[in-house]
């Protein structure tokens, strides 16, 4: 599936907090939109990984996302190395987005 916009966040809820409004507007403009979370947010202080994944699924419904995936990287422990880069590259190739949004 080709996406117009792919937003990548480190933790579930990063994308929603950073650009959820933009994604909602673009969905109303008939754009195909997806989110990829790199981790399950297991080190976060705002709930367990299970809770955050449940909330991410609910947010996907509210935002009417075309897809949402989680790459399952270890929160706080993944590196900017070839292995992790290849995972992200494969997602970008899979969805061939026109626009990629990511947080720093």
Task: Indicate where each model-derived feature is located.
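Active-site rim/loop-helix segments in enzyme catalytic domains that contact anionic ligands
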Residues: 1-95
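Acidic beta-strand-to-loop metal/phosphate-binding motif
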Residues: 98-104
């Amino acid at each position: 599936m080709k996406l117009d916009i792919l937003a990548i966040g480190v933790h579930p809820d990063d994308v929603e907090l950073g650009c959820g409004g933009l994604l909602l507007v673009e969905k109303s403009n008939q754009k195909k939109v997806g989110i990829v979370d790199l981790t399950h947010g297991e080190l976060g202080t705002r709930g367990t990984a299970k809770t955050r994944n449940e909330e991410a699924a609910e947010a996907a419904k509210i935002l009417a996302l075309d897809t949402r995936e989680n790459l399952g990287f270890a929160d706080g422990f993944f590196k900017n190395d070839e292995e992790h880069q290849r995972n992200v590259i494969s997602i970008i190739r899979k969805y061939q987005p026109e626009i990629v949004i990511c947080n720093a």
